[in-house]
Amino acid sequence: MHWDAPVTVTREREHPGDLLRLQSGAILLTFGQRNKPFGVQAMISLDEGKSWDRHRRVVLAWDGDHGDLGYPVTVQRSDGRLATIYYVVYGERDPEGIKGIAPGNAFTKLVLWDDPWK
């Protein structure tokens, strides 16, 4: 068994990530953007994950009030379009993080989009 040493792919507070092999063979990474502007972004690797096109990121959503969002998962439909689902919490947060989420403030959202790297 062999594996390479881990390398940093995203910047600080850009997590968690989800990987998908696209129909084109490229690898898509979607991740939560937990810095302003809060949302979900995507980038691609054309060389089996050896390098990532950090300069051509796609902003899929920028609708968060704060960094409590993310865990995106993406699938590619048979027509080639992409569907990314993620969660987002709106409203004020307890700075100590101990009061939890107010009912009605957490949502699951879906973004349908075209593969811009085709």
Language model: regions and residue ranges:
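Asp-box/BNR beta-propeller blade signature and adjacent active/binding-site loops
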Residues: 1-118
